[in-house]
């Protein structure tokens, strides 16, 4: 029972942090005092569940990594067409961000500007993992479909991920007015025409 209550409180703290990141408070630095007030506990109670604020952010980053990488792997298992795989991975990241605006502040690095550098490193590593997956998908086209691209796969992967990151940054910069998936089909038509 006590373990379950501790897990629930940890989740409650992480959910409160994500909600604060989504609100106007997320545009500025979130203190443990503000977070404790949001959760309805003392700062000391926060530290019983997490040794530091950085560990709270790491908890959210772990959730983001798990959610995105699990779904990307599922796409790779289920879909074999190269361009469809790329389209689905792009849409996955954009839709995830749209559904989780507070977490998008973490993905864009905005929420981590004044936090521990290792948090920014974790997000950079996540994007590097995604870019590596994109490069692999693009490389496999020769094997799967007997076709190659007019440009190196590493350049295409960087261009694709740059499009995604630009959409995430625009979403955060606009205070979540410009939805990342808005006009996705048109953007995809433009991008896929360039890389076919």
Swiss-Prot record:
Cited InterPro entries: Homeodomain-like_sf, HTH-type_TetR-like_transc_reg, HTH_TetR, NO_SlmA, SlmA-like_C, Tet_transcr_reg_TetR-rel_C_sf
Coiled-coil ranges per UniProt: 110-142
Q: DNA-binding region spans which residues?
A: 31-50
Q: Does the keyword DNA-binding apply?
A: yes
* A biological-process GO annotation: negative regulation of division septum assembly
One CC-aspect GO term: cytoplasm
Q: Name one GO molecular function term.
A: transcription cis-regulatory region binding
Q: Which domain of life is it from?
A: Bacteria
Q: Which residues form the HTH tetR-type domain?
A: 7-68
Recorded hits in Gene3D superfamilies, A to Z, give: Tetracycline Repressor, domain 2
Alphabetical keyword list: Cell cycle, Cell division, Coiled coil, Cytoplasm, DNA-binding
Chief localization class?
cytoplasm
Q: Which cysteines are joined by disulfide bonds?
A: none
* PROSITE patterns for the chain: HTH_TETR_2
Q: Where in the cell is it found?
A: Cytoplasm, Nucleoid
Provide the family line: Belongs to the nucleoid occlusion factor SlmA family.
Its biological purpose: Required for nucleoid occlusion (NO) phenomenon, which prevents Z-ring formation and cell division over the nucleoid. Acts as a DNA-associated cell division inhibitor that binds simultaneously chromosomal DNA and FtsZ, and disrupts the assembly of FtsZ polymers. SlmA-DNA-binding sequences (SBS) are dispersed on non-Ter regions of the chromosome, preventing FtsZ polymerization at these regions.
Q: How does it assemble?
A: Homodimer. Interacts with FtsZ.
The identity of this protein, by name, is: Nucleoid occlusion factor SlmA
- Taxonomic lineage: Bacteria, Pseudomonadati, Pseudomonadota, Gammaproteobacteria, Vibrionales
């Amino acid at each position: 029972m006590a373990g379950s209550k501790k897990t629930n409180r940890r989740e409650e703290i992480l959910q409160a942090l994500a909600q604060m990141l989504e609100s106007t408070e997320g545009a500025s630095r979130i203190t443990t005092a503000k977070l404790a007030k949001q959760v309805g506990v003392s700062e000391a109670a926060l530290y019983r569940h997490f040794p530091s604020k950085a560990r709270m952010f790491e908890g959210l980053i772990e959730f983001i990594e798990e959610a995105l990488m699990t779904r990307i792997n599922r796409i790779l298992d289920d879909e074999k067409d190269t361009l469809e795989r790329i389209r689905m991975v792009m849409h996955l990241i954009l839709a995830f961000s749209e559904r989780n605006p507070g977490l998008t502040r973490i993905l864009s690095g905005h929420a981590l500007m004044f936090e521990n550098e290792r948090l920014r490193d974790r997000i950079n590593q996540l994007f590097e993992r995604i870019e590596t997956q994109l490069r692999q998908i693009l490389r496999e086209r020769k094997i799967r479909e007997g076709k190659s691209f007019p440009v190196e796969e590493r350049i295409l992967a960087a261009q694709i991920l740059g499009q995604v990151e630009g959409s995430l940054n625009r979403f955060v910069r606009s205070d979540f007015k410009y939805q990342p998936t808005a006009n996705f089909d048109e953007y995809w038509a433009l991008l896929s025409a360039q890389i076919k």
